């Protein structure tokens, strides 16, 4: 649940500054200083997702397989960086909270395949958190 809340806060900040994420390539080509900043931001997100994946997958000792851990963390970071563009491209109308919680669920889902028998419980817990948080934000 702490991971979910952490990612929710992170995605809320990203959503508030979504103009940086919706046209990243164009923005970085036009403004080199933004390119450097986005590169730094991606590096920080990779570090964060590596720590997050390490924590979430501690029960299956993925740290014994650093290459796997790096792949999971990179997938999580990619999802974080490009989720808002993906949502825009799908064209499905979503409230900001729905967009944020869908992103969080997607980021966390990168860990699920490594959880073995715990995978179903992990998804169920994520879905319960998602439903509870969306319910508290309903009009």
Predicted ranges, named:
Residues 89-139:
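C-terminal peripheral helix-coil segments that are non-catalytic and often amphipathic
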Residues 9, 20, 30, 121-128:
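Bimodal feature
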Residues 1-3, 30, 34, 65-69, ...:
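Residue-level recognition of alpha-helical structural elements
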Residues 15-36, 50-55:
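Amphipathic alpha-helical segments used for helix-helix packing
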Residues 21-28, 56-60, 83, 87-91:
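Secondary-structure edge/capping motif, primarily at the C-terminal ends of alpha-helices
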Residues 34-59, 70-85, 102-113:
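Amphipathic alpha-helical packing segments from all-alpha helical-bundle domains
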Residues 1-19:
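Hydrophobic alpha-helical connector segments
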Residues 59-77, 126-136:
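Charge-rich, acidic-biased intrinsically disordered regions
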